[in-house]
Amino acid sequence: MMDLELPPPGLQSQQDMDLIDILWRQDIDLGVSREVFDFSQRQKDYELEKQKKLEKERQEQLQKEQEKAFFAQLQLDEETGEFLPIQPAQHIQTDTSGSVSYSQVAHIPKQDALYFEDCMQLLAETFPFVDDHEVSSPTFQSLALDIPSHVESSVFTTPDQAQSLDSSLETAMTDLSSIQQDMEQVWQELFSIPELQCLNTENKQQAETTTVPSPEATLTEMDSNYHFYSSIPSLEKEVDSCSPHFLHGFEDSFSSILSTDDASQLNSLDSNPTLNTDFGDEFYSAFLAEPSGGGSMPSSAAISQSLSELLGGPIEGCDLSLCKAFNQKHTEGTVEFNDSDSGISLNTSPSRASPEHSVESSIYGDPPPGFSDSEMEELDSAPGSVKQNGPKAQPTHSSGDTVQPLSPAQGHSAAVHESQCENTTKKEVPVSPGHQKVPFTKDKHSSRLEAHLTRDELRAKALHIPFPVEKIINLPVDDFNEMMSKEQFNEAQLALIRDIRRRGKNKVAAQNCRKRKLENIVELEQDLGHLKDEREKLLREKGENDRNLHLLKRKLSTLYLEVFSMLRDEDGKPYSPSEYSLQQTRDGNVFLVPKSKKPDTKKN
């Protein structure tokens, strides 16, 4: 045996390389890349993906460790569910000497940016809130403890005690100044935070309106400030027994706000007996006491109780109609204010929000749907005629028709109030807000005639065109040219006449077009109805013909069977229907034709 030497697997011959290149070019033409057949390239890609996966896992593990270390420095807030940084315990150094004690602020290193929660905690630790019944500063407590009880009076003060008192006061003043500096520094640090910039403006406004009291004033007013909250009930008790001068102070401040016109109106209120006696007496007549001889004022408790009962109950519409202030009969005696939106006054200069505009809208309300655009413009151009025709739509009633309102204190039942509400009639709405009565007009008839003229008629009348608008629109061309040749017109009149005739002809053409469309629609509807009737008629005839045809077929089959049963062969036997059939020719002859191919036939 001859041993064959095989090439090592790592080495490839030139023929194999050429074959690989040929196959690769074919695969390239088919869309396959060379890396599919290259094992080393695939191995490199696999190792690269493996390294990327390991790097990604390492990054995730590092991120988890960082998060774990971060959350270890935080604590969970049970109220908000947020993670807050753990603050170290702040030790407050206090001076226990017999002079003055003050809480020192713990030093906190300044960071680039502070959290809002850190600042609030710093503020709470630096300036702890005290109760209402505690002294506002520890300095005052120590100062009050240092002063003996027998030295409180200036009569028994010795020179040594006075010197010690002066030294303690100087120490307190220096401590207060240092406290103020520390407070200002802390506030500046707080307001340097971006989240608290919105509070800076409020702090400035408060700094402008408030002042810092001096230490001497604080020491002298300490006792009064200490008992301020506890003295509120006594202050409430003294409100009832305050002097009338205190109450007049509010009236003076109110009168200083008003203008001179309003002040004169207020003075007229005091001098007007109708307003003082009639206005609102139905509302609070239950708790207004009669003026006695001693001139005693009703107690504030009774007034507040009656007022709460009045405001607690609902106000009915009938009660408003019974009130003299809401009754139009007493409008002459009431004083009206400028710019009133109460709905009572209709005089003087009202604002845009006043109910006068709603009154005007009700007088000159929306026109009937039959009005055209030209009539609407004509109504807008002639408001005087509309104003004169406005009260015509309102029914007039005599003074005897109105029911005199009665106060509810006289014991009337609810049914009487309802009947009074139904019988209460409306008065005539005035034409303008400044008039209480409808003005008399002499040219009412002519204004009514002008109110019904169209815009073209008004324009033709203004330009003195001698013939009516209907003739301009409806005349034929020859007659219109002849009529125009008889008169002399300027450019404005000619332009108006041409415009009126053009728009009139367009309007007539549009009407004729709509008319033709309607006629075509009606004609189509009629044709559709006729076609439906004819279709129903044909359907009925078809059904009848089908029934007749079915009856004839049945008769024919009966006759066929009868004739076929009468036929006999040579032996006298009847023919089988499965083997023979009858057929008729055009001349009326009937033949017995076998269904199978047989030459013999018989003639009947």
UniProtKB/Swiss-Prot annotation:
Which top-level group of life is the source organism from? Eukaryota
Q: Which keywords describe this protein according to UniProt?
A: Acetylation, Activator, Cytoplasm, DNA-binding, Glycation, Glycoprotein, Nucleus, Phosphoprotein, Transcription, Transcription regulation, Ubl conjugation
Basic motif: region residues: 498-517
N6-acetyllysine sites (modified residues): 595, 598
- Residues bearing attached sugar chains per UniProt: 461, 471, 486, 498, 568, 573
> Per the record, where are the segments of Polar residues compositional bias?
340-352, 395-407, 578-587
Check the record and name the InterPro entries matching this protein: bZIP, bZIP_Maf, bZIP_sf, NFE2-like, TF_DNA-bd_sf
Region spans: Leucine-zipper:
521-528
> Which compartment or compartments is the protein found in?
Cytoplasm, Cytosol; Nucleus
Output one GO MF annotation. Answer: molecular condensate scaffold activity
Q: Does the keyword Ribonucleoprotein apply?
A: no
Return the Pfam families for the record. bZIP_Maf
Indicate where the modification Phosphoserine is found in the sequence.
40, 214
Chain spans, region Disordered? 334-447, 570-604
Where is the short sequence motif ETGE motif located? 79-82
Give start-end ranges for motif DLG motif: 29-31
Domain writeup: The ETGE motif, and to a lower extent the DLG motif, mediate interaction with KEAP1.
Assembly and partners? Heterodimer; heterodimerizes with small Maf proteins. Interacts (via the bZIP domain) with MAFG and MAFK; required for binding to antioxidant response elements (AREs) on DNA. Interacts with KEAP1; the interaction is direct and promotes ubiquitination by the BCR(KEAP1) E3 ubiquitin ligase complex. Forms a ternary complex with PGAM5 and KEAP1. Interacts with EEF1D at heat shock promoter elements (HSE). Interacts via its leucine-zipper domain with the coiled-coil domain of PMF1. Interacts with CHD6; involved in activation of the transcription.
Free-text function comment from the UniProt entry = Transcription factor that plays a key role in the response to oxidative stress: binds to antioxidant response (ARE) elements present in the promoter region of many cytoprotective genes, such as phase 2 detoxifying enzymes, and promotes their expression, thereby neutralizing reactive electrophiles. In normal conditions, ubiquitinated and degraded in the cytoplasm by the BCR(KEAP1) complex.
Q: What is this protein called?
A: Nuclear factor erythroid 2-related factor 2
Instruction: Cite the source lineage.
Output: Eukaryota, Metazoa, Chordata, Craniata, Vertebrata
